[in-house]
Amino acid sequence: MTVITRFAPSPTGRLHLGHAMSAIRAHDFARARGGRFLLRIEDIDVGRSRPEHVAGIVEDLRWLGLDWDDLSFQSARLASYQMALDALKMRGLLYPCFCTRAEIAASLSAPHAGDAAVYPGTCRRLTPAEAAARMHDVRMGGAHCWRIDMAAALAVTGPLWWEDARAGTVCADPGAQGDVVLARKDAPASYHLAVTLDDAAQGVTDVVRGDDLFAATDVHRLLQALLGLLTPRYHHHPLMLGADGERLAKRTGAPSLAAMRERGEDGLKVAAGVRAMLAGDAPHLPSS
């Protein structure tokens, strides 16, 4: 079987060294095994995605000396997401949710609500008549999303497992995340649904990604079982940390690869530094 990996950034900002590490891991894993490396642009968030960031992603990866066998865009696969949603709706596994973020936050801050930010299932308890009335409001411009009925879904699938290169066999517990959102009015598919369908459609055999998505894999395994999709092997890796010990992130102002390039740094040397860091298994920001 041909090994296929992918790097799937969102074009909502410039890439930083943490992205470089993940891309290099996925690229080198495939190339070392004579496999294919795919670049997938996760541009489904229309409100935040920018064309200039797509061009920046391509430029940054080429600067690092990476190449890929295919370039794809999530925005070209909207019909496939809708088909999957329709199939889950037909089986009674999704329900419309009309709660605002403020309402959910208020319910979770109530006494004895627990520490985990898990949706309390408010709209799951609506009667068919109540849900129909609220959907009328939606057609008049109201907001809504579609959530998976986790208890009903787990009753269909039964116990689930998946394999991780470091953790071994993982007993999936998607129920711990509650009735997660699979689509919103302004987003035809959530990350959970889109990434699961995309990996299957592209034949990805090995998913190489950060530890921050380890728990999300439980939900992806559930969707694979419900939709009859193959389960890839997973390789979750530690996130790159800055000198302060905190993870690098766009929102915290991590230095971008573009800024490094503009300072005249050599992308191939930067990539070599990342590989040397990975060989030492210490994902800390290399000193300049």
Question: Predicted segment positions?
Answer:
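Residues that form generic nucleotide/phosphate-binding pockets
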Residues: D60, A84, S107, L126, ...
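Short alpha-helical "patches" and their helix-cap loops
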Residues: L38-D45, H236-P238, L285-S288
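Non-catalytic terminal extensions that flank enzyme cores
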Residues: M1-R14, L64, A133-R139, A143, ...
